[in-house]
């Protein structure tokens, strides 16, 4: 075991070439994959927007609801992934197999529960986002678009959950290229069939919003097929997949350990995701225009956010592997370097987003007032990006050492205790502009950054959990 030594300021801020080369090898495929995913999401959004503002708003509402499911899957698989990264760092392939099996079982259960929930309560959930000020005709049309889109998208939950199990395990072992290739090919399929089915090009029918949903579901099955076939054809590269389906037995002690650390993470992701859904609902009381503008803002900002989000995922991988190998000082050094890198990247990407803010909304076929509102919201998102990036990297650092209860308090509790009450009060009891409300709510992340800085500095997360 490496001695836990003090670090110099320079060691914390700057790495050597080997460090940046290693981080680049891990993070670049993730950035490419996720950025392309979000570019295609933007193109999807624009194509749906060509149909009209109401279809775009209906799709945005369903997207926010499904986002909670996505986070539940990510939370459940990431909890096991903490162990997977450390098992891989220790060279324990059987341990990685067990964590993969755990992911499959839990994600299947979550997917089944989500499908039942959305079939039973999808309509009232959608209606909560339609402002009382919306005309009856517009409200009925938005609801109809959203219901049709949701029903088709539920089919895509099955391949999505399975893909996350495979892709997450591959990334935890440092193998990020195959998930990237699968995602890129799936995005091509998604884009092509979006164009064909939304607008009815060639012999294909004009399906509008339903066509967008069908294209997305089809692309998810393509992505799953590529990842599964590619991974099982190269088991010498992915040895943890050898014999992985011979049994689903997982040692009870490991299941207990994963549950102890996974449950706070799963609850955190679901509470954070539902918190984001409630925030959108708070903003939606200002009218359907606010929902449309926020949809444009979030879709565009997400492309630029992928740099710090990918660096956060890379932090969990590289720091987790250091902890699993018992290089505790190396883990601390790596964490501080990743925080510095994330903050610097956010300054650059935030500036780029602010520069692009007046131009990108113009590709949408919507009212000029919505474009102008989206531009102002994008500028606020750009201003807050360094806060988002620093807090995200702190979150993944704490999580890498298994401190999932602390991350639960740090992330979702903050959302529900600070962000949601502020958005609720400001949107309902003040006459503040939606842009000002958005800035106040997101600017509160500076408190989260300060709390995370103290926790990372104290080193409460520096633990090898697979040795315990």
Give the residues covered by each predicted segment.
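Small-residue-rich hydrophobic transmembrane alpha-helices
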Residues: 56-116, 160-179, 280, 291-357, ...
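Transmembrane helical elements of multi-pass membrane transporters/channels
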Residues: 25-44, 152, 186, 219-223, ...
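Small-residue hotspots at the loop-to-helix junctions and early N-terminal turns
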Residues: 53-64, 146, 150, 213, ...
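Short runs within selected transmembrane alpha-helices of multi-pass transporters and secretion channels
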Residues: 77, 152-171, 179-187, 212-228, ...
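Helix-terminus/linker motif at the lipid-water interface of multi-pass membrane proteins
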Residues: 35, 39-57, 126-140, 198-207, ...
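Short alpha-helical transmembrane segments in multi-pass integral membrane proteins
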Residues: 1-27, 84-156, 204-262, 319-384, ...
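Generic alpha-helical transmembrane segments of integral inner-membrane proteins
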Residues: 31, 35, 39, 43, ...
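Hydrophobic/aromatic residues within transmembrane alpha-helices of membrane transport systems
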Residues: 32, 44-48, 59, 84-89, ...
């Amino acid at each position: 075991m490496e001695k836990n030594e003090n670090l110099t300021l320079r060691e914390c801020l700057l790495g050597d070439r080997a460090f940046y080369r290693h981080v680049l090898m891990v993070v670049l495929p993730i950035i490419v994959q996720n950025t392309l995913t979000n570019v295609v999401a933007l193109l999807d959004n624009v194509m749906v927007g060509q149909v009209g503002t109401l279809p775009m708003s209906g799709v945005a509402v369903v997207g926010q609801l499904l986002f909670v499911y996505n986070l539940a899957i990510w939370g459940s698989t990431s909890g096991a992934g903490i162990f997977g990264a450390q098992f891989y760092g220790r060279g324990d392939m059987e341990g990685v197999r067990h964590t993969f099996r755990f992911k499959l079982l839990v994600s299947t259960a979550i997917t089944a529960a989500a499908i039942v929930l959305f079939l039973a309560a999808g309509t009232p959930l959608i209606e909560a986002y339609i402002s009382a000020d919306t005309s009856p005709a517009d409200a009925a049309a938005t609801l109809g678009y959203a219901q049709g889109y949701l029903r088709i998208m539920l089919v895509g939950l099955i391949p999505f959950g399975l893909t996350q199990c495979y892709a997450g395990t591959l990334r935890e072992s440092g193998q990020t290229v195959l998930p990237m290739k699968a995602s890129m090919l799936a995005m091509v399929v998604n884009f092509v069939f979006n164009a064909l089915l939304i607008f009815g090009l060639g012999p294909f029918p004009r399906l509008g919003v339903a066509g967008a949903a069908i294209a997305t579901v089809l692309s998810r099955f393509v992505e799953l097929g590529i990842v599964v076939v590619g991974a099982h054809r190269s088991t010498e590269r992915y040895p943890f997949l050898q014999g992985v389906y011979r049994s689903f037995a997982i040692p009870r002690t490991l299941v207990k350990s994963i549950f102890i650390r996974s449950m706070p993470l799963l609850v955190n992701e679901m509470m954070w995701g539902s918190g984001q859904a409630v925030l959108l609902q708070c903003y939606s009381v200002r009218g359907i225009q606010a929902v449309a503008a926020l949809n444009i803002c979030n879709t565009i900002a997400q492309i630029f956010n992928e740099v710090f989000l990918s660096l956060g995922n890379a932090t969990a991988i590289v720091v987790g592997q250091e902890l699993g190998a018992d290089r505790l000082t190396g883990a601390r050094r790596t964490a501080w370097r990743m925080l510095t890198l994330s903050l610097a990247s956010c300054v650059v990407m935030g500036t780029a987003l602010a520069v692009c803010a007046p131009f990108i909304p113009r590709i949408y076929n919507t009212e000029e007032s919505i474009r102008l509102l989206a531009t102002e919201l994008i500028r606020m998102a750009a201003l807050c990006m360094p806060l988002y990036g620093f807090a995200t990297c702190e979150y993944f650092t704490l999580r890498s050492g298994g401190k999932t209860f602390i991350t639960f308090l740090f992330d979702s509790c903050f959302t529900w205790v600070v962000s949601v009450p502020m958005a609720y009060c400001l949107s309902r009891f003040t006459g503040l502009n939606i842009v000002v409300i958005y800035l106040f709510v997101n600017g509160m992340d500076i408190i989260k950054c300060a709390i995370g800085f103290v926790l990372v500095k104290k080193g409460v997360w520096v633990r090898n959990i697979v040795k315990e």
